[in-house]
Amino acid sequence: MNFVIDIFNKSYYFKLGKRRDTFQKIFEYLESLDKKNPTILETGIARTNENWEGDGMSTLIFDDYINLVGGNFTSIDIEPSNINFAKSKVSSKSNLICSDSVIALHKISRDKAYPMIDVLYLDSFDLDWNNPIPSSFHHMKELLAIYPKIQKGTLIV
């Protein structure tokens, strides 16, 4: 079974609005790896059922992906209510962490048992187009915190 053709295009593509092509590229990339157990790490988590075009629905899609192909998926969010919402929507295969993302990523980067990352999806700080510096700075801190788990070929989104 092909995730992009059999699941993503049928269940998610038309819900995601302008984000759909980016997500399609992410899953096409994962499938091109031909890897049995890819590792996906996300910051920022699903917050609502309704906002497919804007809010954190990647958590649900990444969960579907690892349920089909196997692998590891971790999502980090600082807000307990977001974690609780996501727990009600994803399978037990997803690892959800309630923490400041930079602190959690730093811990993961030092965990010898945690695999190298295939897709790093940084979405924990919403971008303000009128003032992009705070979001950019936060995501750079996240990237530096997880850097030891980045490998040649890691897709960073």
Residue ranges and their predicted role:
Residues 1-157:
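A short alpha-helical cap/connector motif
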